[in-house]
Amino acid sequence: GKEAFSCTSDHGDLLIHVPHLSRTLRILSPGMPVNILGVEFEDDEKRTAEMVIIAPDYLIDVSALSACMKPYGDSAESYFLDMISPKETTIPIMLGNAANRFMDDLVNTPVDFNDNEAVNQLYEESLHKHFMENLLNYSCLDLPLDKSYFDTLKETFRNIKSSVQHRFPSAEVGLPLEDTLLEPSFICETLGLRGRLDVMAANHKSLVELKSGKAEENYGHLQGPQRQHVMQMSLYKEMLHYNFSMPRDNVKSFLFYSRYPVFYN
C-alpha cells in the first residue's frame, strides 16, 4: 500500500515516508495544508515523519477530542456524534460547575484556611454565586435536589479547600497560590488544537485538571484515572511543549478527582 506522500515546504518539494500512518495517507488530497512533525532525514532522498497534522488551522478542542475515548471503544466518529447530540443538564454536570466555582474562589479569595468561620463564610458565598450563575440550569433538571446533593457539594468544597491549602504548594505539585493561573486558554497551531486548562503555574511547569466525577473504579476500589482524562492531560502537555518549547519531562501534570480526593500524576 501507499507509504509516502509528496509536499511543498519552505525547503522545497519533499517526499515524506509515513508507513505507520496509512489511515492518514488515505485522507490526504492535493492542496491540503498539513504540519509535519518529527521529521528525520535518513538520507538525501528519504525522510520520515512522526506525525502529520491535517488542516491545522481547524482548531479542535482538546476535551472534545479526548471524549472520543469511550469505555466501550475509541472512535473519531464520536466527535461528530457528540457535536450533534442534544446538550443535557444533569446533576453531575452541575456538580462539576460547582467544583469549578469552589476552585476559583478558594484560589482567588484571601482567606485564612485555618479559620473555620471564615472558611464557612466563603463556602456560603461561593455556593450562592454558583446558584445565581446556574438558575436556569437548575430549573431544567429532571430530578429534584435532595439533602444528599448539598452534602456532596459541601464535601467537594472541603476536599478542594484541603488540596488548595496543602497539596498545591507542596514540592510535589508546585503550585503556590500567588503564582497560580486559573483557566488559561491556549491554541496550538502546530497540533491544530485549542483548550482551556483548569489550573497552571505561571511558569508553565505544573498543571492540575479538576475532575468532579469518578476515576476508574473496580467494585468500588480506585484503579487509576480514566483513559480519556489521561489523554486530555497529555494533549495539554504537548501544547505547552510545542508552544513554549517546554521539555516534556519538565512539566508536572496532575488529575485531581475532588470526590475522593486523589491526585494522579
Where on the chain are the PLM-derived regions?
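Hydrophobic (often cysteine-bearing) scaffold residues that line and stabilize catalytic clefts
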Residues: I91, L95, Y149, Q228-Q232
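A non-catalytic, helix-rich entry segment at domain boundaries
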Residues: F102-L182
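Extended, charge-rich, solvent-exposed interface segments
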Residues: R47-L95, R101
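Structural detector for short beta-strands of small beta-barrel domains
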Residues: G1-E3
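Short, amphipathic alpha-helical segments that act as regulatory/interfacial helices
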Residues: G96-V107, K237, H241
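Flexible glycine-rich surface loops and low-complexity tracts that mediate binding to linear polymers
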Residues: T24-E50
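A residue-level signal for conserved active-site and pocket-lining positions in enzyme catalytic cores
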Residues: P71, A99-N100, V199, Y236
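Mg2+/Mn2+-dependent nuclease catalytic core
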Residues: C7-P30, V34, L175-N265
